[in-house]
Amino acid sequence: MKRVTLLLLIFITYLPAQQMDRLFWNGSDWRRLEKLADYDPELTYMMKIAYINGILDGRLFYYLKAWMIEQTFADSLYAETVDYLTPRELVKVLDNFYADPINGYIPLPSAIIISNMFGERIPMDTIDEYIRHSKEWINRMILEQK
């Protein structure tokens, strides 16, 4: 009986953490991974790689689901290149991107697109425009929630 109670207590404790929307993690969440990994660089790197691979796998999954229904729509919806950089390069670029406090509240999916834009050598005007739109979008979304 004590084991069941203990397992139930652990499950209830971790349940709210599972409900957290990790899709909208931003720079503060990205930087917090170091603290969660107890400042171990290898563990921090593995956690960041796992997050990036999860986002890319999820994107591929939903692209393929949409592609089965309507190929043209799926191709236009998922037109951004998010796999130009390797995951290792992407971690480095994201670390540098979030080192600037101004970029701290841009969601990670947008930061991944921006990082790949840097890697593809897209003109800075276009990248700055995308960053501005990302900031406006997240600001609108935050204000609508309140």
Give the ranges of each region predicted by the language model:
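Sec-dependent N-terminal signal peptides
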Residues: 4-13
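Enrichment for repetitive, rod-forming helical segments
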Residues: 9-10, 55, 66
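Immediate post-signal-peptide N-terminus of mature secreted/exported proteins
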Residues: 18-53
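Compact alpha-helical subdomains of small soluble proteins
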Residues: 19-28, 61-146
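Extracytoplasmic/secreted envelope proteins and their assembly/folding machinery
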Residues: 48-59, 91-95
